[in-house]
Amino acid sequence: MRKWIIAAVVILAIVGAGVYVAFERLDIIVKVALEYFGPGVTGTEVRVGDVEISPRSGRGRLRNLEIGNPQGFSAVRAARFNDVILEVDPATLRSPIVHVNAIGIDAPTIVYERGGKTTNLEVIARSMEAHAKRSEEEASASSSGVTAKRKFIIDRLLIRGGKVTMTSAALRGQGVTFDLPDIELRDIGKRQGGVTASQAASIVANAIVAKIAQRVLSNIDLLRKGGVEGAIDALKGLIR
């Protein structure tokens, strides 16, 4: 009997330690989750340099988050987010719906690459939309006994100081770089009572693609001045 009691105490201690580590080391969990599950959302490689998250304050920071380019495109990566600041309500970290007060993304660098009849960002956005749809279907199945995915409500998301490089295979690795207008999104998931992480990512990706398209169409003269010799026709092809 004593051996069983000792064994039970040891098991409880191990479980307790696991729960403690899981809660205290959210930074490790988030980094692994981004790099392991991220490719299933974006359809590309995902890498993150460093993650810092405090479960007590709810403040977090991601550095050097990189989204790879889809197959068939030549640029090294589609996007790099050097600095991402998070502010989460710590009381909701273990809740079914996590309340994110703010997300700030400073100085991202994005590559807008044309390939055939589409662009790399459109390919990534479609992958995110498809994953978001599957997540929604899985969430709706929760009433049938399937565990629901955690959802998020994001009060404010701000992307500022971004740069976009527009290129294509015809430009042989070179392109035209221009400023990305600031993007501000509010109340993501509020109307729906929360959205999954992939749904939130899809909303943000579509907002970025739309803003880039708007910027391209309103700055044709700027684009004509850049690139390599003979690249005007290639640049025209990017905005068709």
Question: Where does each model-flagged region fall?
Answer:
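N-terminal leader/targeting pre-sequences
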Residues: 43-72, 160
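Secondary-structure transition motifs
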Residues: 64-187, 191-240
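Generic alpha-helical scaffold signal
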Residues: 28, 56-59, 75-80
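N-terminal type II signal-anchor transmembrane helix
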Residues: 1-43, 228-230, 237
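Short, functional N-terminal and low-complexity linear motifs
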Residues: 1-6, 50-55, 92-94
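A near-ubiquitous, low-amplitude feature marking generic local secondary-structure context
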Residues: 9-21, 31, 45, 67, ...
